[in-house]
Design a protein with these regions (language model features):
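Metal-dependent nuclease catalytic core centered on acidic motifs
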Residues: 213-301
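Linear, non-domain "peripheral" regions
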Residues: 1-95, 262-263, 270-271, 277-336
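Hydrophobic/aromatic-rich core segments of domains that either
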Residues: 149-220
Length: 336
């Protein structure tokens, strides 16, 4: 099926997109396309790369034309020579097949959970931002990636298990400390579209998988995500949010669930707070209640909080932590 960004183009630009795709898949040194200006060609190329994560070996292009000609010649820039590209394509295809095969026949939700878990359990953020970390070969073959490579990997895995997926792209905002553009995904699960940011969840892990950005609607994702570069379809559903069953409005409910976790000897308890602004006063009250419950069982408690998404992780330990309250900032690699 044609990619989401392809479907937003007019007929002429679709023709350029198709020619780019065919030429790059064939590893052509030059690709002839109808003459458009540079920004238009760059926009089509961006859409192609977001739609097609398997073009991991293409890093950009230049172009040239003759005066008066009705076409231009694109000159793709490849990350490797042809022999290496073919080797990497085979390795990536085999890796995707191994990961996708056990998910065939599973529910949409189970597929999404497995893909999310793969990223969190197998990929670390590459603060050096190597070229391959921006593409799927970083997460799939090296175990490292930046947000772009991670989001493209999520899409490649979703494509492999027939789960509709878009790579979302937002602007940088240097005035707010966001130095780079950011990428994540929009996934259709059981007929409903949701935002999924595996990079942000990956950056929040402290001994347990996190799902702060698992199936958010537009209202919640844009609390800490910037303006989109390319428009996305609306995401208005909230029933798929991972922490929905663990979303509380009363401190006593948090305390009761913390006691359950302690009885079950669980080292961590993560929940969502929707009882008003998650300020220091409320956090202190929640932490004091849970600390008293932990002390009854000879345990200490500390917490880390994602204030933008109002998600709190409680950690139960035998010895007190240095700082009982940690305010987390997701995706530290994206900050100035």
């Amino acid at each position: 099926m044609a990619g989401y960004y392809y479907r937003q183009l007019d007929r002429e630009k679709r023709g350029v997109y198709d020619a780019m795709l065919a030429g790059m898949e064939a590893l052509a040194p030059g690709i002839r396309v109808p003459r458009l200006d540079g920004p238009e060609l760059s926009d089509i190329y961006l859409r192609l790369k977001l739609d097609t994560p398997l073009l991991f070996y293409v890093t950009g292009f230049q172009y040239r034309w003759m005066p008066g000609a009705d076409h231009v010649e694109l000159l793709p820039e490849y990350l490797f020579d042809k022999g290496k590209i073919r080797q990497h394509r085979q390795a990536v295809a085999a890796r995707l097949d191994r990961l996708a095969r056990p998910l065939q026949g599973k529910s949409d939700r189970d597929k999404e959970l497995a893909i999310h878990a793969f990223i969190l359990e197998n990929v670390r953020y590459d603060k050096l931002k190597k070229p391959y970390s921006h593409e799927i070969i970083g997460p799939l073959t090296q175990g490292v990636g930046v947000c772009e490579g991670i989001a493209k990997t999520v899409k490649a895995l979703c494509d492999a298990v027939q789960l509709p997926c878009i790579v979302a792209l937002s602007e940088a905002a240097p005035e707010r400390g966001v130095k780079y553009r950011h990428t994540w995904n929009v996934i259709t699960v059981d007929g409903q579209r949701y935002h999924l940011d595996a990079t942000f969840d990956n950056s929040l892990q402290r001994g347990t998988l996190r799902y702060d950005y698992f199936n958010l609607d537009d209202r919640h994702i844009f609390r800490d995500h910037e303006t989109l570069v390319l428009p996305l379809p609306p995401c208005t559903a909230d029933k798929g949010y991972y922490y929905r069953p663990l979303s509380f409005t009363k401190p006593e409910d948090v305390e009761n669930r913390a006691r359950q976790a302690l009885r079950k000897k669980q080292p961590h308890f993560v929940f969502h707070w929707r009882g008003g602004g998650l300020n220091r006063e409320i956090l202190t009250d929640l932490l004091n209640r849970c600390a008293a419950a932990a002390a009854e069982r000879g345990k200490c408690v500390s917490c880390s909080v994602n204030t933008a998404q109002a998600v709190v992780q409680l950690d139960f330990t035998d010895a007190p932590a240095g700082d009982p309250l940690l305010v987390q900032q997701p995706d530290e690699g994206n900050e100035l």
